[in-house]
């Protein structure tokens, strides 16, 4: 069984005499920076000129510097800007400001695993990947808890990379819930697979197909929306809280029986093969190459698809219904 590291296993003092630069002040950036500061770590924020986040970071009491300055002055530099921006930022502002023994950190392995960022041999390269969005990382921290995380060491120049990355994980509150060791390869490939096959791509297509099946059969659009999309949160929350057994305990016996006899009629071997194909494209770099190319060419297909999805019938029905749900406001 994989080992989990908790508060008692990690020494936060490792970071107390270091300066940490958090590059980016978005979802994860604000959470990492504030949690580290609350734990007594010296934190500065590195942002590009004209960043919309600069004012917010200053209002939150942080010293804001350019990415280059923050990198140069820090002992640990955490890259928290979006994946598609990291290569450019690294090449222009980080690469030439790294010094021997510095720690270069990431919250996702994409750019290291797919060789978009190629650090020099004289730095440690690590990852701390919280298993939750930034607002949750911050919110549960303020309540005395934490979001679990994965950690990895890609390059250990100082022979102290593991204690450094674990201290960082403790600094953001992750060891309160537990952190699990992985590799950049495993984190990247499993994270992308989960997003594409289940959490985002898979669930979106399942919902849309269920909705369309009911509407095509003559049922009201609003009823189809409630049954196939709105109630999804109720079920997912139960699974999140206590696994499939909690969900099945909480639903009716009729629903549970339908789960057993019909689930496999929908998610067939064809779906399994589709998942395998998705995983292979992640493993062999085909997906990464396509995403990198999409960004290099201006995101035309990406933005077109986003617009098309916004204008689908189910999206319009959802917006109308949610506008009448006062409890969502």
Swiss-Prot record:
Its cofactor is Mg(2+). Pathway: Amino-acid biosynthesis; L-isoleucine biosynthesis; L-isoleucine from 2-oxobutanoate: step 2/4; Amino-acid biosynthesis; L-valine biosynthesis; L-valine from pyruvate: step 2/4. Mg(2+) 1 binds at residues 191, 195. Belongs to the ketol-acid reductoisomerase family. This is Ketol-acid reductoisomerase (NADP(+)). It holds the Pfam family KARI_C. GO terms for molecular function: ketol-acid reductoisomerase activity; magnesium ion binding; NADP binding. It is an enzyme of class 1 (oxidoreductase). PANTHER family: KETOL-ACID REDUCTOISOMERASE, MITOCHONDRIAL. GO terms for cellular component: cytosol. Binds 2 magnesium ions per subunit. Transmembrane segments: none annotated. NCBIfam families: ilvC (TIGR00465), PRK05479.1 (NF004017), PRK13403.1 (NF009940). It comes from Clostridioides difficile (strain 630) (Peptoclostridium difficile). The keyword Magnesium applies. Residues 2-182 form the KARI N-terminal Rossmann domain. Its EC number is 1.1.1.86. NADP(+) binds at residues 25-28, 51, 53, 83-86, 134. Gene3D superfamilies: 6.10.240.10, NAD(P)-binding Rossmann-like Domain.
């Amino acid at each position: 069984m994989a080992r989990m590291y908790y508060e008692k296993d990690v020494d936060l003092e490792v970071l107390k005499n270091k300066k940490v630069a958090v590059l980016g002040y978005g979802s994860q950036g604000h959470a990492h920076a504030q949690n580290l500061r609350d734990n007594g770590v010296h934190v500065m924020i590195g942002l590009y000129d004209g960043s919309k986040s600069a004012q917010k970071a200053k209002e939150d009491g942080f010293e804001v510097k350019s990415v280059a300055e923050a990198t140069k002055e820090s002992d640990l530099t955490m890259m928290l800007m979006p994946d598609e921006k990291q290569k450019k930022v690294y090449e222009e502002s980080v690469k030439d400001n790294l010094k021997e023994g510095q720690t270069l950190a990431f919250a996702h392995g994409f750019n290291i695993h797919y060789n978009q960022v190629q650090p020099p041999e004289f730095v440690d390269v690590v990852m701390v990947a919280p298993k939750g969005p930034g607002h949750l990382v911050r919110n549960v921290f303020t309540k005395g808890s934490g979001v679990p995380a994965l950690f990895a060491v890609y390059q250990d120049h100082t022979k102290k990379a593991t204690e450094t990355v674990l201290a960082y994980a403790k600094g953001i509150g992750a060891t309160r819930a537990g952190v699990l060791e992985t590799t950049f390869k495993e984190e990247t490939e499993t994270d992308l697979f989960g997003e594409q096959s289940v959490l985002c791509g898979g669930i979106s297509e399942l919902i849309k197909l269920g909705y369309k099946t009911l509407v095509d059969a003559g049922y009201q659009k609003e009823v189809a929306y409630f049954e196939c999309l709105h109630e999804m949160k109720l079920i997912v929350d139960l699974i999140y809280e206590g696994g499939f057994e909690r969900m099945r305990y909480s639903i009716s016996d009729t629903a549970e029986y339908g789960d057993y006899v019909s689930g496999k009629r929908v998610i067939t071997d064809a779906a399994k093969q589709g998942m395998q194909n998705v995983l292979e494209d992640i493993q062999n770099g085909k997906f990464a190459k396509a995403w990198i190319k999409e960004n290099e060419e201006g995101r035309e297909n990406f933005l077109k698809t986003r617009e098309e999805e916004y204008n689908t019938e189910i999206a319009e029905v959802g917006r109308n219904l949610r506008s009448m749900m006062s409890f969502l406001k």
